[in-house]
């Protein structure tokens, strides 16, 4: 019988630099945070307000909240949720949940009411930790999601509008004089115990609840401490993040930073001048961004005003970054390249990462320790050799436990042999660098040709008059779909639809021309992490052009 899996075509990641440690995610996190607390290290800094949280303060508050949650009545398998924008208190409930074996479901106050009802309806939390901004929505959601018994205000030092703040909740649910040092973390079955319930990207409808275990989380901790695939561990190192904490990318990079003792400098929103000033003032060595912000930095006229000599790394994730934009930004910051990572919410974190000192323009990186990857033919499903495009599949100990109450969708994603089918088109080269080309679902089918939107977006972004662009297929009764684009022009620049179409036609093969037309817009529709919203672009392109 023919072996369907040619082992030569399976790319295997290296052995881990450090072995996976014993204990739950909470046990490991506490051990490292105690170490950094003794060193007097700072855990979080809000660059806008200047507020600092030391590791000692953060650990104490997380232990006290863990005890308060237990006394409130939450036991292993209980559920809590967050509904908040990024704030310095965001990770206190997350860490407390990890300490006591309670599943944590992060959401953002930017969610619409419909999205929030859907998300919290999946995770069914008993307590929601809400920011002041998110409170009205959570109060409304509570009427529908009746498991929610208590709302606690996350980002206030005093009670707010009749709802208890974090300190009040802790005080009410811990004995007088309670010492955080007496609190004991709960050991759990790592493989089975759900640590976090994340929202899938929702690119194919409303998000699903992704169950990530303590095993998934501690594997990520091992990668975070890996000097080749993660960080050089030096406590006190300042890193700047503007990535949403409720998203897998922001959640697991930040938990990884805490394992390494870094000072997480956060901006609650992106402003070019504040961003550059923060990099300079806090001597940040690394910054983590979503691709949307690269276009702004690429065209920035403020860069030369600031001393960014401490910056040694720009990391990108959450959505694909075009090779050209990545290279241009790296040049402007005098860096050898941009550090990329590729992963899905369902793989916990990045499972393909640029190894330290092994940049390759356009590549997403190499397979991380403890993981395997392969590229399969879209028709035969056989694994392919180097430089042949197909669907990327991955296997390893950070694959989710499954979707909440959705075994059918779980089976569609992860096959019987344990391979997760990513739905992304890609290939790897002879040196085992992986290149992600586009989403399988977003490929435009024009007369039997498969046209990747990302390739056309990359071509458009190279034009000096174009600031940003997004591409999608427009339904057509004869051709199937026609490639079309929405374009944001640089300030003060003008182009006609024909000029854009002619420019693209001069750069690509016949099937890839913009036959679906061009629309000029103020901004390209994108999700929170900078992922282009193909469905919204398709709707814009389907509308007839308004006649002047």
Swiss-Prot record:
GO terms for biological process: bioluminescence. GO terms for cellular component: peroxisome. One of its GO terms (molecular function) is ATP binding. It is an enzyme of class 1 (oxidoreductase). Its EC number is 1.13.12.7. The keyword Metal-binding applies. A motif (Microbody targeting signal) lies at residues 546-548. Keywords: ATP-binding, Luminescence, Magnesium, Metal-binding, Monooxygenase, Nucleotide-binding, Oxidoreductase, Peroxisome, Photoprotein. It catalyses: firefly D-luciferin + ATP + O2 = firefly oxyluciferin + hnu + AMP + CO2 + diphosphate. Its main location: other. It comes from the Eukaryota. It is found in: Peroxisome. PROSITE patterns: AMP_BINDING (PS00455). Its cofactor is Mg(2+). Pfam families: AMP-binding (PF00501), AMP-binding_C (PF13193). Produces green light with a wavelength of 544 nm. PANTHER family: GM05240P, LONG-CHAIN-FATTY-ACID--COA LIGASE. Belongs to the ATP-dependent AMP-binding enzyme family. This is Luciferin 4-monooxygenase. It comes from Nipponoluciola cruciata.
């Amino acid at each position: 019988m023919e072996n369907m899996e040619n082992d030569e075509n399976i790319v295997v990641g290296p052995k881990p630099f450090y072995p996976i440690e014993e204990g739950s995610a909470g046990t490991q996190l506490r051990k490292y945070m105690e170490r950094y607390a003794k060193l007097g290290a700072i855990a979080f800094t809000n660059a806008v307000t200047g507020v600092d949280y030391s590791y000692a303060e953060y650990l104490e508050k997380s232990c006290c909240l863990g005890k308060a949650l237990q006394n409130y009545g939450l036991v292993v398998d209980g559920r809590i949720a967050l509904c908040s924008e990024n704030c310095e208190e965001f990770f206190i409930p997350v860490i407390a949940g990890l300490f006591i074996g309670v599943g944590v479901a992060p959401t953002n106050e930017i969610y619409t009411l419909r999205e929030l009802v859907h998300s919290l309806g999946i995770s069914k939390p008993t307590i929601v930790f809400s920011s002041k901004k998110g409170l009205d929505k959570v109060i409304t959601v509570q009427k529908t999601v009746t498991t929610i018994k208590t709302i606690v205000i996350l980002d206030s030092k005093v009670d707010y509008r009749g709802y208890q703040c974090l300190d009040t909740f802790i005080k009410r649910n811990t004995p007088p004089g309670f010492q955080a040092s007496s609190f004991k973390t709960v050991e759990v079955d790592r493989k089975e115990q759900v640590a976090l319930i994340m929202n899938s990207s929702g690119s194919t409808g409303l998000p699903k609840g992704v169950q990530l275990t303590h095993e998934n989380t501690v594997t990520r901790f091992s990668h975070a401490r890996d000097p080749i695939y993660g960080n050089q561990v030096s406590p006190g190192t300042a890193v700047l993040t503007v990535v949403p904490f409720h998203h897998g990318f922001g959640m697991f990079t930040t938990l990884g930073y805490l394992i390494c003792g870094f000072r997480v400098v956060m901006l609650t929103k992106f402003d070019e001048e504040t961003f550059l000033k923060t990099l300079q003032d806090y001597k940040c060595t690394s910054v983590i961004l979503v691709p949307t912000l690269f276009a702004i930095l690429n065209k920035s006229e403020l860069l030369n005003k600031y001393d960014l000599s401490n910056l040694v790394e720009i990391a990108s994730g959450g959505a694909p970054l075009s090779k050209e934009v990545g290279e241009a930004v790296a040049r402007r910051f005098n860096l050898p390249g941009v550090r990329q990572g590729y992963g899905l919410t369902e793989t916990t974190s990045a499972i393909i990462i640029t190894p330290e000192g092994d940049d390759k323009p356009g590549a997403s990186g190499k397979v991380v320790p403890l993981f395997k990857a392969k590229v399969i033919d879209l028709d035969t499903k056989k694994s392919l050799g180097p430089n042949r495009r197909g669907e990327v599949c991955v296997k390893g100990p950070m694959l989710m436990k499954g979707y909440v109450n959705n075994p059918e969708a779980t089976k569609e994603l992860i096959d019987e042999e344990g391979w997760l089918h990513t739905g992304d088109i890609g290939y790897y080269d002879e040196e085992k660098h992986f290149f992600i080309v586009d989403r399988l679902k977003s490929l435009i089918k024009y007369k039997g040709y498969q046209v990747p939107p990302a390739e056309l977006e990359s071509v458009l972004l190279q034009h000096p008059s174009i600031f940003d662009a997004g591409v999608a297929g427009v339904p057509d009764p004869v051709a199937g779909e026609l490639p079309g684009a929405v374009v944001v022009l640089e300030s003060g620049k003008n182009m006609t639809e024909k000029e854009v179409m002619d420019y693209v036609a001069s750069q690509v093969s016949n099937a890839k021309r913009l036959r679906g037309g061009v629309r000029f817009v103020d901004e390209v529709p994108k999700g929170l992490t900078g992922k282009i919203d193909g469905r919204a672009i398709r709707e814009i392109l389907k509308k007839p052009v308004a006649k002047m």
